[in-house]
A protein has these predicted regions:
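Active-site anion-handling motifs in enzyme catalytic cores
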Residues: 1-254
């Protein structure tokens, strides 16, 4: 049986990469053939040949300063920054690269699993897919396939979909064979806004053991002794001063 995992595109988000890897691993251990749907990596724009030639002449023959083309330069920066995360994705995640979800055919997969990550956060959907309905398997609404939502997240406890989108989402989710979300607030949103009952389940990263993750780092070089503090949202509640004070008493340097 072939399973496709639909999540947000795999870029620099460590959590996104790990949840995709964990869900893939958990399903493979059950004996399934698993692929993670992912966007082809490329610049957002294609530069016309004539423009490229003109820029090369100005820069290398006429020795003129040439302003960078924003999106291309952004892609180059992202490519450099993403070196290690892309390396992880290419090595450990079975990616099915595609330009858009419309290129998938009904007989490509038997099951579609949506999740985890903030795949149901509206602003992220609009930045990643053609339309809101794609994140709810709108492209496959007439197909004879199994549909599962495992631990997707709305990203917050506010419903920001339009009334028209809400109607479409409700109809699409009613086609699912199993519905679950990552947060309790997601359970409440589904009931209040869609009239649908969902289960509250653990993030896919919790499906693996510590030993599963240790295997991934067994061949890495030893730490230099320094410490990286990664804080998603710095708030008063997330004050790290006590922890940093303790860290400074050790050999670690935050």
């Amino acid at each position: 049986m072939k399973i496709a995992i639909l999540t947000l595109p795999l870029h620099t988000n460590y959590g996104g990469l790990l949840q995709a890897y964990a869900l893939q691993s958990a399903l493979e251990r059950m004996g399934y053939e698993v692929s993670v749907l992912d966007k082809i990596r490329k610049p957002k724009v294609q530069i016309p040949f004539s423009v490229s030639v003109k820029r090369l002449i100005m820069k290398f023959i006429l020795r003129k300063n040439v302003a960078p083309i924003g999106q291309l330069e952004d892609y180059k920066r992202r490519k450099k920054r993403n070196t290690n995360t892309w390396k992880f994705a290419d090595k450990y995640i079975h990616r099915h690269e595609l330009d858009n979800l419309g290129s998938i055919k009904e007989d490509d997969y038997d099951v579609f699993v949506v999740g985890s990550d903030q795949i149901w956060r509206r602003e992220y959907i609009l930045n990643s897919f053609k339309c809101v309905e794609d994140a709810f398997l709108g492209f496959a609404k007439t197909w004879n396939v199994k549909r599962i939502a495992y631990a997707p997240s709305f990203g917050h406890d506010v419903w920001d979909y339009t009334p028209e989108e809400t109607v479409s989402i409700r109809a699409l989710l009613r086609l699912f064979d199993y519905l679950s979300v990552r947060e309790e607030s997601g359970v409440e949103l589904c009931m209040r806004e869609l009239g649908l009952t969902t289960k509250h389940v653990a993030d896919p990263t919790m499906l693996l053991t510590a030993e599963d993750y240790k295997v991934l780092i067994k061949n890495t070089s030893k730490s230099s002794g320094n410490l990286l503090c990664y804080v998603l949202d710095m708030t008063e509640e997330a004050d790290l001063k006590p922890e940093l004070a303790w860290v400074k008493t050790t050999v670690l340097v935050p």
